[in-house]
């Protein structure tokens, strides 16, 4: 199953691989029909981005709200169990519970998402560890990878075999590719996959490929003791407050986006006294919650200014803020009802938020946060 833009190196190279392996390729009609098309095609392999998996995860979570009594308790017991799945290191007790959950719950979920997946490649951004574990547990094997267009477009990827695929890591380096972590925690690499340079732009090329041939990715990361790469953020996105404290927005956003109420979030605060955020709620989940709790509103704008809705997000802040140092905690936020999408230019083709566009588009709202 293919649905990412073919102009993007990530999808294009994987399509070349499908052709090489003799696969039949089915193209989704559009992003909105992916779930429906998966049921029609029953694919064995798919390349995707974490945002698509997050939406599947959220839909499965929301579906449990329709259950009642013992069925509902069993549904969410299985849901929580899946989040703690380990590929090679589960206890005998966990495996027994997993076997029961698979018989009663996971088998139905697999059927709902095609029922035939053997490999799901996730790239373009980091997937949350508990979500990768969840899909592995229910029988939708997620293989995480990492790279850039400049690296053709992969430098590390999870692989079959004990210890080569661990949720939250992007696997070991590809054969023939060297990866190092600099003193600034930047990921740099060298290998035959690295580009020769930017077309007719030697100055920009020199900015990313040093004299020793190392390509500087601009991303930060670290290795596990077993040699698996973990992505921790984007070097240029790390900023400093007016008090000289560094903040990595990626780590904060990753935690807050575990909330079913939050679809996307951008942490701000460069040269400011504190960290703040623009939050795009998961409007489907939020509206369903309001319906179940009889919270009335007239439109999206009135929904996001409703006192009960504000209370919900204040509670989420109190839940996640303690996970961070005082200077990293979100002190102010604004809810944004406008959809963040590829069509309106806020998301990249791999569904990552364009921070510069956010800062331009919501300048007045951001200024208000720091008044």
Specify the residue positions occupied by each region the protein language model found.
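Conserved AMP-binding/adenylation subdomain of ANL enzymes
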Residues: 6-106, 116
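Conserved A3 ("GATE") glycine/threonine-rich loop of ANL adenylate-forming enzymes
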Residues: 8-10, 51, 124-131, 144-161, ...
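Active-site loops of AMP-binding adenylate-forming
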Residues: 136-141, 148-167, 201-204, 283
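Conserved ANL (AMP-binding/adenylate-forming) active-site segment centered on the GW(Y/F)…HTG consensus within
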Residues: 163, 167, 194-218, 252-253, ...
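Conserved ATP-binding/catalytic segment of the ANL
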Residues: 173-241
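Adenylate-forming
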Residues: 194, 228-257, 286-307, 326-330, ...
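C-terminal boundary motif of the adenylate-forming
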Residues: 220, 225, 259-285
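Conserved C-terminal "lid"/linker of ANL adenylate-forming enzymes
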Residues: 239, 264-267, 289, 310, ...
